[in-house]
């Protein structure tokens, strides 16, 4: 039950420490949070780690182009499916 409690920042009567909950404490475990975490992890893997540590510039360019084409076509297909 304690994990479901919404934490509010508060100030103790003594001292100047202000309690701030962690992201894990604030998490509700919904589908929106899982999707946001997936996108954030994908960003870190794709944009940060691969181009700088594992690839040459031509490999990074090809992967970047393919990734953007796939994402763009997927988004277009999803929007077309929803609205038509």
From Swiss-Prot:
Name listed for the protein in its UniProt record: Serine palmitoyltransferase-regulating protein TSC3
Main location: endoplasmic reticulum
Localization per Swiss-Prot or TrEMBL: Endoplasmic reticulum membrane
Membrane topology type: Single-pass membrane protein
Transmembrane segments annotated in the record for this chain: 63-83
Any one GO cellular component localisation term in the record: endoplasmic reticulum membrane
Top-rank lineage group of the source organism: Eukaryota
Keyword Cell cycle: no
Keyword NAD: no
Function description: Stimulates the activity of serine palmitoyltransferase (SPT), and thus plays a role in the biosynthesis of sphingolipids.
Organism per entry: Kluyveromyces lactis (strain ATCC 8585 / CBS 2359 / DSM 70799 / NBRC 1267 / NRRL Y-1140 / WM37)
Keywords, ordered alphabetically: Endoplasmic reticulum, Membrane, Transmembrane, Transmembrane helix
